[in-house]
Amino acid sequence: PIAGSMVLAAILLKLGGYGIIRMMQILPTTKTDLFLPFIVLALWGAILANLTCLQQTDLKSLIAYSSISHMGLVVAAIIIQTPWGLSGAMALMIAHGFTSSALFCLANTTYERTHTRILILTRGFHNILPMATTWWLVTNLMNIAIPPSMNFTGELLIMSALFNWCPTTIIMLGLSMLITASYSLHMFLSTQMGPTMLNNQTEPMHSREHLLIALHLAPLLMISLKPELVI
């Protein structure tokens, strides 16, 4: 069920990060070298999840692995125990909660009309549902973390915190963000561009679907304009 996927990506996936934040408050702040293996594993896990996204043919699986890759950045930022890292992790968790939930909602909108989640079979929607294509574009750009979105604020703070802690981490962070942009654009082009594979008549998007996406993106845009609300 799509509702379960949306709740899982938006709320339940963030409980692990919240637990780590609480645990870090009772651990010594001067022993970050002890956490070096965990930081490396978190960043490496983010890269592997991103590479897995590039191999996915199932739309829902691609979005799910995307959520895992973002949580790798969050874990690495929390573990170094700096104010910038903590602020960036909180910003990215909140922003990604809205973004991933909106992506799952759009995936369900596509599935209800095509009855498949295979990327190559869902193409050509820009001719049939142009408004849905607009929602896909905006949400994918948020997932890539373009400025001035909250996703960009979170990733910038995380990148700055990790670079100040160890400049070498910029290599893994840069690679992760490059692959994120690649699979996000691949997902958009695969589901929206090209000739349509549908032979039957497709019904337009309902008002409730537009409202649901707007209720995801409106708070995200508001927080992006005023980040002091959450960090």
Swiss-Prot record:
Per UniProt, which keywords does this protein have? Electron transport, Membrane, Mitochondrion, NAD, Respiratory chain, Translocase, Transmembrane, Transmembrane helix, Transport, Ubiquinone
Keyword check for NAD: yes
Gene Ontology MF terms in the entry: NADH dehydrogenase (ubiquinone) activity; ubiquinone binding
Q: Which reaction does it catalyse?
A: a ubiquinone + NADH + 5 H(+)(in) = a ubiquinol + NAD(+) + 4 H(+)(out)
Its transmembrane ranges are 1-21, 34-54, 63-85, 89-111, 128-148, 156-176, 211-231
- Where is it localised? Mitochondrion membrane
GO process terms (BP): ATP synthesis coupled electron transport; electron transport coupled proton transport
Q: Which family does it belong to?
A: Belongs to the complex I subunit 4 family.
Q: Give the protein's recorded name.
A: NADH-ubiquinone oxidoreductase chain 4
